């Protein structure tokens, strides 16, 4: 039978293997997106051109061949699809590099500070829990499958694969933001490099990962519309309504989750709501062009057009309000703690006020802007705690 130390060594090596596997999957996804964008690489079609609004969808046996007028389902513009998929792949690769950096730093610091094996495992889970790494690899592989299916114009299968990908992506974001351990505070205090990775870098990665979920909410809603359009004999405007409803519900759920749950771990979280705002704008642009081109095929859809615009406008206003609310609450939380983050914010505000006074009243020298002010005098100079609680097992 293996002892506790052998079991901990096996767990540590298994975690390293997961990190390497996730990094390989993320790198493969990025390379697939690059190669799929090059005509000479042998892909039959460009994957991002899902809905061709310039030609009719007259596929033999397709659902729209049984209609007097034919039209493709609502989807994002080609540059938008490319940007959203590229952003998601970049986020997954960034998370993989973050995990690799965490493994390197943790291995070095564990030898230098003689951490106990259990502390090393706790710290590894704080950087990236094993379940998080597995979900990240599944996100990369499923999105790669989506790209290959879209390149071969298998719209229904691609839509089903993307829905699966979004489920993994949402779980990946939730696990990364919340899952960890609170038993490594002594190790983080003793090792500033480990603290920079497991706390500060983790907060940045949390922002972009949840931002990718916000963009994916729009894509998964439209993919559901494509799946419905290719599977059932239903009206075009119903698929557009279904896509809008799914996107709205998922976007609202994400913003509520960020504000209620994730804000307990990291306060500065503007990226998820900002990405929802970007996704709403992209959805609105695609819907406007779609309704304008296929108004005749859609029939009496004036109410649908107005309703779509109204819902997207309200969702955009909510996302904008959530950005402001999150930043204000973050400043209040850091001010109450007396952290360096709020000291820097206060210093920037003081500098801007002095600059405006100088320009408006025409007095003072530029050196006055560099004079020490109250912005950083009354706050603690110690490291701020970005993650107030490091999560739960």
Curated annotation (Swiss-Prot):
- Asked if Membrane is a keyword of the record, the answer is yes
What residues form the membrane-spanning segments?
A: 15-35, 84-104, 131-151, 155-175, 208-228, 242-262, 265-285, 304-324
Q: Which residues lie on this side of the membrane: Intravirion?
A: 1-14, 105-130, 176-207, 263-264, 325-393
Which InterPro entries does the UniProt record give?
Herpes_glycop_M (IPR000785)
Q: How does it sit in the membrane?
A: Multi-pass membrane protein
Q: Where, per UniProt, does this protein localize?
A: Virion membrane; Host Golgi apparatus, Host trans-Golgi network; Host endosome membrane; Host nucleus inner membrane
Give the Virion surface membrane side ranges.
Answer: 36-83, 152-154, 229-241, 286-303
On whether Transmembrane is a keyword of this UniProt record, the answer is yes
At the top level, the lineage of the source is Viruses
Q: Where is the major localization of this protein?
A: virion
Swiss-Prot/TrEMBL keywords: Disulfide bond, Glycoprotein, Host endosome, Host Golgi apparatus, Host membrane, Host nucleus, Membrane, Transmembrane, Transmembrane helix, Viral envelope protein, Virion
Please give the subunit comment from the record: Interacts (via N-terminus) with gN (via N-terminus). The gM-gN heterodimer forms the gCII complex.
Query: What's this chain's function?
Result: Envelope glycoprotein important for virion assembly and egress. Plays a role in the correct incorporation of gH-gL into virion membrane. Directs the glycoprotein N (gN) to the host trans-Golgi network.
Family as reported in the entry's similarity comment: Belongs to the herpesviridae glycoprotein M family.
State what protein this is by name. Answer: Envelope glycoprotein M
The record's gene field reads gM
């Amino acid at each position: 039978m293996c002892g506790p130390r052998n079991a901990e060594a096996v767990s540590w090596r298994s975690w390293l293997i997961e990190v390497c596997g996730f990094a390989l999957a993320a790198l493969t996804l990025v390379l697939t997106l690059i190669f799929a964008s090059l005509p000479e690489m042998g892909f039959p079609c460009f994957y991002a051109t899902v809905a061709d609004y310039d030609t009719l969808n007259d596929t033999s046996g397709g659902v729209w061949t049984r209609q007097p007028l034919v039209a493709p389902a609502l989807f994002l513009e080609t540059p938008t699809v490319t940007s959203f998929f590229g952003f998601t792949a970049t986020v997954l690769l960034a998370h993989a590099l973050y995990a690799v950096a965490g493994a390197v730093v943790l291995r070095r610091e564990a030898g230098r500070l003689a951490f106990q094996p259990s502390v090393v495992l706790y710290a590894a889970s704080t950087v990236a829990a094993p379940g998080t790494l597995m979900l990240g690899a599944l996100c990369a592989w499923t999105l790669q499958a989506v790209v290959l299916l879209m390149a071969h114009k298998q719209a229904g299968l691609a839509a089903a694969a993307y829905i699966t990908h979004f489920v993994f992506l949402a779980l990946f974001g939730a696990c990364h933001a919340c899952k960890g351990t609170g038993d490594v505070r002594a190790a983080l205090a003793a090792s500033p490099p480990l603290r920079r990775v497991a706390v500060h870098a983790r907060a940045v990665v949390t922002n972009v990962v949840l931002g990718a979920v916000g963009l994916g909410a729009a894509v998964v809603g439209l993919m559901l519309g494509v799946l419905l359009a290719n599977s059932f004999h239903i009206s075009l405007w119903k698929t557009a309504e279904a896509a809008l409803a799914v996107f709205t519900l998922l976007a609202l759920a994400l913003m509520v989750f960020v504000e209620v749950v994730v804000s307990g771990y990291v306060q500065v979280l503007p990226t998820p709501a900002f990405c929802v705002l970007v996704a709403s704008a992209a959805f609105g642009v695609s819907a406007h062009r779609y309704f304008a081109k296929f108004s005749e095929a859609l029939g009496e859809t004036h109410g649908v057009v107005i309703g779509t615009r109204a819902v997207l406008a309200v969702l955009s206003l909510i996302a904008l309000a959530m950005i402001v609310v999150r930043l204000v609450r973050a400043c209040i939380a850091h001010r109450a703690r007396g952290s360096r983050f709020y000291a820097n914010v206060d210093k920037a505000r003081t500098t801007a006020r002095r600059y405006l006074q100088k320009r408006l009243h025409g007095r003072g020298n530029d050196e006055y802007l560099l004079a020490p002010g109250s912005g950083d005098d009354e706050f603690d100079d110690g490291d701020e705690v970005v993650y107030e609680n490091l999560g739960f097992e």
